[in-house]
């Protein structure tokens, strides 16, 4: 850092204010990431590929920003840039959400889905300013913290460990460091890492457990915006920068006034769904729910994906009668999802039927009761707010018919309703000869190669549990499974039972269930098709390919450029950054594995999922704090030992998850609740310990070292986020992903040991 600039930071900005500013970065980054993630998923009809693209772009861009931060050592006025960047990261999230909602239907055709290439480019462009600024600030903060670490004869309450003697003189243009300067630089990297993660913990707790329940995304983002503007003003005042201080204060006041006067959530939502009347929009813990009304039809949309529409008589009647016609005398019917669309009431046409309707999102139920009271207000409909799979696992009731009216398996969470393990759980709650029904993919007279794979996998997975499987090609492919008899003569059964229908009648069924269409479906079945399992979700991957097949996938200069840059970067990684890269990849990959394991074991319980993410951030903070205290006694071999510890951990994870999943013991089931959060904490502690130690082992100067390590960490995490959930787990399975993480960390440990000899 320029000598005059160093003096300004040392003498003018107190360390508590500097670390408060870094903590505010962490709060802002975590809240912004979660809010933007949900907005982007909604804007681009998010499946897990979109999730991976968004998170991968976020990590990659922040890593690039950190790499650019090494130029901070040449700045003449770093405080001014520090304040300006903090103002920027305060305002950009609100602007990003506004632009995303208003420009989505300007850049792309309204109502159309954006392809993969368009999504990658859009996410990259939208997130680039914020992520680059955040990454740069982290490196700049490391430099500021290094200059402000006290000498032993300058005691302070904030000193974490003793450091060396006073900073020695530096010759003009020289790169020589005294021992004291080196120790200060090494310490600063770990301290900034700790306070950044502390902010992430606070942001995660606030977002997950408080703000999301009471505020829109705009309302949530106002909190970190005002916080960052306040800290920017405080830093500017401390540094006697009057103009930036006044600007920060005025912007904070203006933002508060604008929030009070204008409801940006209402304004942008109406622009986003122009042509339809938005009758409700809001955020629940499970996503963004929008309800529009068009010509008397209500459309429920969650995270950009249509949940259901009212007056869709064809879909409602097919969903109900293909299944119920198999057992017209059914008394107990379980309906998982979709009941508010009219399916629950349609089931009541069968005189003996009583319906248990299970819906995960309480907001969907609340809005449906408000807008569609006639659909659920009946003493024969029992509404249960729970995760469908968890309910099936825990219920002691027996059902004659189980109808899963869920979307296609576009995410690993939804895929849980299409696995062999779930089908086996349903089998246990079915009465003898009971029927399970669900639909998968559309049928318009032609079965594509991608759709054929979906059908074959679903049929073979069902056949592992049920004696009989029947597929009826309606507007969608309806799967029926039972140990009893199944018949395609749906029209005969409906007429014999005297059930009135509006569309699904004999003429309709004769047109749909023709011998040719039935033969087309049978033709794609295969005894060699893979089986969809909890920890090997191949059906989700095939659905992803089915979704991608709807677009013209172009691998253009943008994607090629990213790949080339990444390959060059990986080829040039030295041992210490390689350890951080491997740890970042393992952290991202194994966190996805643990979240998947928790959802499989205990269902999608939002607060618990939020707890796991918060525990991960907490573990990073604990690990970095612990290593900062023992840093003087640790060296290169300890970094290799941490990489080996992550290797061993990675090898243990799949076997622990499978043991917890297969055990029928109530004690093991009880232990599994805290087990996964504790496993997450342990993983994060190991990864968090690596970063400060790498800052010491690979130290050159503060800017270069911080930039290099943050870049390696974020790029490793970006690859883990992008590849693991979208490709590696669906194709290879959980065990292979854990082996890959173990192998990468074993390689980094070996390189570290060999290079140190």
Residue spans of the language-model regions?
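Alpha-helical transmembrane segments of multi-pass membrane proteins
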Residues: 1-757
């Amino acid at each position: 850092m320029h000598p005059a600039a160093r003096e300004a930071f040392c003498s003018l900005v107190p360390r508590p204010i500097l670390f408060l500013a870094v903590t505010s970065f962490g709060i802002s980054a975590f809240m912004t990431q979660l809010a933007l993630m949900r907005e982007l998923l909604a804007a681009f009809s998010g499946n897990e590929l979109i999730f991976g693209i968004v998170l991968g772009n976020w990590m990659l861009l922040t890593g690039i920003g950190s790499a650019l931060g090494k130029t901070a050592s040449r700045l003449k006025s770093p405080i001014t840039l520090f304040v300006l960047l903090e103002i920027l990261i305060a305002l950009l999230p609100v602007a990003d959400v506004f632009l995303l909602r208003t420009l989505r239907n300007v850049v792309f055709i309204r109502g159309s889905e954006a392809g993969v290439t368009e999504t990658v480019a859009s996410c990259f462009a939208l997130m680039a300013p914020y992520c680059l600024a955040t990454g740069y600030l982290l490196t700049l903060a490391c430099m500021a913290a290094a200059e402000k670490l006290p000498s032993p004869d300058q005691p302070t309450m904030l000193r974490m460990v003793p450091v060396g003697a006073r900073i020695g003189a530096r010759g003009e243009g020289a790169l020589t460091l005294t021992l004291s300067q080196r120790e200060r630089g090494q310490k600063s990297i770990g301290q900034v890492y700790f306070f950044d993660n502390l902010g992430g913990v606070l942001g995660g707790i606030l977002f997950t457990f408080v703000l999301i329940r009471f505020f829109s995304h705009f309302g949530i983002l106002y909190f970190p915006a005002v916080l960052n503007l306040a800290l920017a003003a405080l830093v500017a005042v401390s540094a006697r920068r009057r103009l930036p201080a006044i600007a920060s204060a005025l912007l904070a006041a203006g933002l508060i006034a604008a929030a009070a006067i204008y409801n940006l959530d209402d304004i942008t939502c109406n622009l986003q769904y122009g042509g339809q009347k938005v009758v409700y929009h809001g955020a629940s813990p499970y996503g963004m729910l929008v309800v529009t009304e068009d010509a008397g039809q209500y459309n429920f949309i969650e995270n950009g994906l249509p949940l259901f529409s009212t007056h869709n008589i064809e879909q409602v009647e097919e969903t109900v009668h293909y299944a119920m016609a198999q057992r017209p005398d059914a008394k107990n019917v379980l309906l998982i999802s979709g009941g508010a669309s009219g399916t629950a009431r349609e089931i009541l046409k069968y005189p003996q039927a009583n319906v248990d309707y299970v819906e995960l999102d309480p907001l969907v139920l609340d809005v449906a009761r408000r807008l569609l009271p006639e659909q659920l207000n009946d003493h024969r409909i029992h509404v249960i707010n729970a995760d469908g799979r968890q309910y099936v696992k825990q219920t002691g009731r027996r059902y004659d018919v189980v109808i899963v009216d869920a979307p296609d398996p576009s995410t690993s969470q939804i895929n849980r309703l299409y696995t062999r393990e779930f089908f086996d759980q349903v089998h246990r709650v079915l009465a003898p000869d009971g029927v399970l029904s669900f639909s998968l993919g559309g049928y318009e007279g032609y079965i594509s190669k991608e759709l054929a794979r979906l059908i074959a996998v679903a049929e073979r997975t069902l056949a592992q549990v049920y004696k009989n499987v029947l597929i009826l090609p309606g507007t969608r492919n309806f799967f029926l499974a039972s140990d009893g008899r199944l018949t395609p003569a749906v029209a005969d059964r409906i007429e014999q039972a005297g059930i009135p229908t509006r569309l699904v009648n004999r003429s309709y069924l004769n047109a749909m269930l023709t011998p040719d269409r039935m033969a087309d479906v049978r033709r794609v079945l295969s005894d060699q098709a893979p089986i969809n399992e909890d920890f090997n979700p191949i059906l989700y991957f095939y659905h992803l390919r089915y979704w991608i097949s709807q677009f013209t996938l172009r691998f253009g200069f943008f994607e090629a450029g990213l790949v080339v840059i990444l390959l060059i970067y990986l080829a040039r990684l030295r041992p210490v950054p390689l350890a951080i890269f491997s740890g970042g990849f393992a952290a991202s990959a194994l966190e996805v594995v643990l979240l998947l394991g928790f959802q499989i074991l205990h269902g999608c319980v939002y607060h618990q999922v939020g707890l796991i993410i918060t525990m991960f951030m907490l573990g990073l903070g604990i690990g970095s704090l612990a290593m900062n205290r023992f840093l003087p006694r640790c060296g290169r071999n300890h970094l290799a030992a941490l990489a080996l510890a992550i290797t061993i951990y990675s090898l243990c994870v799949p076997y622990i998850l499978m043991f917890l999943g297969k055990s029928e013991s109530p004690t093991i089931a009880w232990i599994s609740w805290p087990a996964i959060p504790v496993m997450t904490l342990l993983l994060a502690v190991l990864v968090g310990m690596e970063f400060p130690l790498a800052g010491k082992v690979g130290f050159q100067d503060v800017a270069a070292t911080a930039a290099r390590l943050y870049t390696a960490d974020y790029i490793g995490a970006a690859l883990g986020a992008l590849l693991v959930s979208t490709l590696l787990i669906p194709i290879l399975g959980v065990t292979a992903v854990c082996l890959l993480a173990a192998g990468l960390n074993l390689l980094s440990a070996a390189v570290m040991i060999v290079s140190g000899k």
